[in-house]
Swiss-Prot record:
The lineage of its organism: Bacteria, Pseudomonadati, Pseudomonadota, Gammaproteobacteria, Pseudomonadales. HAMAP family: Ribosomal_uL6_B. GO terms for molecular function: rRNA binding; structural constituent of ribosome. Pfam families: Ribosomal_L6. This is Large ribosomal subunit protein uL6. PANTHER family: 60S/50S RIBOSOMAL PROTEIN L6/L9, LARGE RIBOSOMAL SUBUNIT PROTEIN UL6M. It comes from Pseudomonas fluorescens (strain ATCC BAA-477 / NRRL B-23932 / Pf-5). Signal peptide: none annotated. One of its GO terms (cellular component) is cytosolic large ribosomal subunit. GO terms for biological process: cytoplasmic translation. Part of the 50S ribosomal subunit. Keywords: Ribonucleoprotein, Ribosomal protein, RNA-binding, rRNA-binding. This protein binds to the 23S rRNA, and is important in its secondary structure. It is located near the subunit interface in the base of the L7/L12 stalk, and near the tRNA binding site of the peptidyltransferase center.
Amino acid sequence: MSRVAKNPVKLPAGVEVKFAGQQLSVKGAKGTLELNVHSSVEIVQEAGELRFAARNGDQQTRAMAGTTRALVNNMVQGVSQGFERKLQLVGVGYKAQAKGTVLNLALGFSHPVDYELPEGITAETPSQTDILIKGIDKQLVGQVAAEIRDFRPPEPYKGKGVRYADEVVRRKEAKKK
């Protein structure tokens, strides 16, 4: 059995889990998420927790059980607490402004960059150089943060660009004559 799949997922108060065939639905205070479970993974709900097991013992099936357990754990955490990712803009004139479902970015280009936020994701700008991306789907929050960072990734000489708040940018020294 996968070492990840051995650990059960604890269901906090206020989180409901429903099975319909291979469709798993997790409902909580912040919303609902759904997942198509692979047919080789067996899920058992007992005493406020979910247990995962592979239907047969081959390597790929055991790996799929561990992956499913990790995805369901992220879903449970998302509908109960939510996820957030913080980005920082470093550079002269770099600004961000959230307007509803659009994030307006000034990143040193000759034009402003307007990023349309997908459904289920919100963005806040506590200051002009900080962006806070929030949502219940961990994969989608990370994907949106990566797409925003890709507009202007941090460069190694001056460190200018869009970076994650916890990211360490390796700096290079300029070439000398």
